[in-house]
C-alpha cells in the first residue's frame, strides 16, 4: 500500500504519490490537480473542494475556508481578530479556542479548525484512493516551516481525524527543495534558497544540497500570516471604497456582494501577473447596481507595496542565521502561487543584485511532490533515485523554560538540527522548596512574557534542602515532526515526570479527537447516503422522461389511446411528485420507481411487441433502452444542474 504526500494549503491543497520511480500529482474528480481548501454546509449536504468554492457566493456564511489561519491558534490571537473582518463565516470562542459556527441541515453546528482541515484531508485521501484503486492510510503532511508546536500538533490531529496515519509532518520549503533537488539531478554542493509565498503563509529556507541526495536545512524564517489572501484583502478594500465613492453605497455589510467582489479581485490579481491591466465586471453587485472598473498593475503594486517589501525581511534573517552572504546562494527557487506576482519577483531579484530566479518547478505542485517523495522514503521505498536521500531539518523557534524573574532560559536554539535532545540542570529558588513548576516556552525574546507559552507541569516530592542544593535535570527532546517532549528528574530521589507538549489552550484533548473521528465517520456516511439519494432520484427522473418520450413519439397504431393516456397520466403524476418532493429519501424514490415500472412496463412491452409484429424487421426495438425500461442498466449520465 503506497503512502501519499499531502500539501495542506491555506487556499488550495494538492496530493501526490511516488510510484514506479516518479511522482504523480493526482487530479481530483473535477480534473484539477489542486483542490480548494473549502468546506461548505447546506441544508441538505456537505461539500468539499471545488463544489464548495463554486457555491460560495450563494452561501457565504456557511462556506468555511482559511482553516489553516485558525489551526493551533488561540481565539484572542490578534491575527485572528484581523482576519475575522474579512471572513463571512462566524468564529466564536469555545474555552479560549476558536470554533467555526455554521448552519448544517437546519441545525447550528460548531467545528474546530482541525475538523475543517480534516475534511479537506479526507477529500485529498479520497482523491488518491480513486486514482490508486486501493485504500490509503499512510501520509506525510506539510506545514509552513514557521508553524509553531501547537500548529504542528493540531495539523497532526487533523490527519488523525481524517483517518490517516501521519508518518511525518514536514516543512513546506524543505519538501519543495526535495522536489527541486531530485527533479534537477543536482551535482556538487549547492546552497539553495527556497522562497515560498502561498495563499496564506510565507517561508524562506536555505538548504545545502549535496550531490542531489543530502538535503541539509541551514536556516528558516517566515511569517505564518502573509500570503495571497492578504493581497486579495487589499484589493477588495480598494474596490469596495471605489464602489462607495461612485455610488454612495457601502457593500461591506452584505456578505454575498463582498464574496462576489473577492472572487473578482482574486481573478484580477491573477490577470495582473501576465497583463498590465485587469477589467472587473460584476452585474448587479449590490442593490441592483452593476460595477465595472479597471485595475492597473501599478495600482495593485502600490496597494500591496508594504506587504511585498515585508517578504525581504525573512530572506535577510535566513541569510544571517545560515551565516551566508547573498553571493553564496547558488539557486533561488520560487514556490507557491503568489510568487507569480511580477513585483515580488523583481524585489527578490534586486535584493540578490540581479541574480536570475529559478522558475523551473511548478510552484503549485512542488510541495506535494516533495511530500510524496518523503512519504515513499519513510514507508521504505528503495528505488534508485530516492534510496540515498537524507533530509536534515531544523527547529524554527527556540525552546526553553522560565527561570527566576521570568527569564527565558533556552535549551534548544532556533535552527538547531532535528531530531535533537538537550539537557540542563536547574535548582530550587527558595529553602525547603517541595516542588518546582516547569513552564515551557517557545520564541526568541529574553523574557517569557514576550514568548509563546507551550505548557507547564509540576515536579513534586523534592526532599527539604537549602535553596540551590537540589539538582533538577530538565531534558528537551524535539522529534522529527518538530514536536516537543519535556522531562524533569530530581537527581537525589530519581523522581521524574515528563509531558509531550500539548498546548492546552490551543490543543484538542484525546477525548475531543476521538469524538471528532466518530463525527467524521458519521459525516462520511451522511455524504454517502446523500449521494445514493441523488442517484435514485436521477434514475427515477431519467426513467420517467424516457417512458414519456417513447409513448409521445410512438408511431400511430403501435399503442391504443387508453394505454397511451394511462402511461402519460402516470408519468405526469410522477413528475409532479418529483417537483414537490425534492428532498424525499432514497427509499421514497425507489418506491416510486417500482410503482411506475409496475404500471408502465407491461404497456411498454406490449407496444414494442406490436411494433416488432408489425414491422417484423430489424431495428423494430429502437424505442426501448437496453436492459428494459424496468432495469437500471445502461450507462449512468451525470446530470449537471
Swiss-Prot record:
GO biological process: chaperone cofactor-dependent protein refolding; heat shock-mediated polytene chromosome puffing; protein refolding; response to heat; response to hypoxia
Any one GO molecular-function label of the UniProt entry: ATP-dependent protein folding chaperone
Biased composition (Gly residues): 613-633
PROSITE patterns: HSP70_1 (PS00297), HSP70_2 (PS00329), HSP70_3 (PS01036)
GO cellular component, one term: nucleus
Swiss-Prot/TrEMBL induction comment: Heat shock induces the synthesis of seven proteins at five otherwise inactive sites in the polytene chromosomes of fruit fly larvae. Two separate sites, producing two and three copies, respectively, code for the 70 kDa protein. Expression is induced by proteotoxic stress caused by toxic protein aggregation, for example by overexpressed Atx-1/ataxin-1.
Gene3D superfamilies: 1.20.1270.10, 3.30.30.30, 3.30.420.40, Actin, Chain A, domain 4, Substrate Binding Domain Of DNAk, Chain A, domain 1
Annotated SUPFAM superfamilies: Actin-like ATPase domain, Heat shock protein 70kD (HSP70), C-terminal subdomain, Heat shock protein 70kD (HSP70), peptide-binding domain
Keyword list, A-Z: ATP-binding, Nucleotide-binding, Stress response
Additional information: There are 5 or 6 copies of the gene encoding this protein at two separate loci, 2 copies at chromosome locus 87A7 in reverse orientation (Hsp70Aa and Hsp70Ab) at locus 87A7, and 3 or 4 copies (depending on strain) at locus 87C1. Most strains have three copies at chromosome locus 87C1; two tandemly repeated Hsp70 genes (Hsp70Bb and Hsp70Bc) and one in reverse orientation (Hsp70Ba). Some strains, including that sequenced in the Drosophila genome project have an additional copy making three tandemly repeated Hsp70 genes (Hsp70Bb, Hsp70Bbb and Hsp70Bc).
Role summary: Stress-response chaperone protein that prevents toxic aggregation of proteins.
NCBIfam families: PRK00290.1
Family listed: Belongs to the heat shock protein 70 family.
Designated name of the protein: Major heat shock 70 kDa protein Bbb
Originating organism: Drosophila melanogaster
Primary gene name: Hsp70Bbb
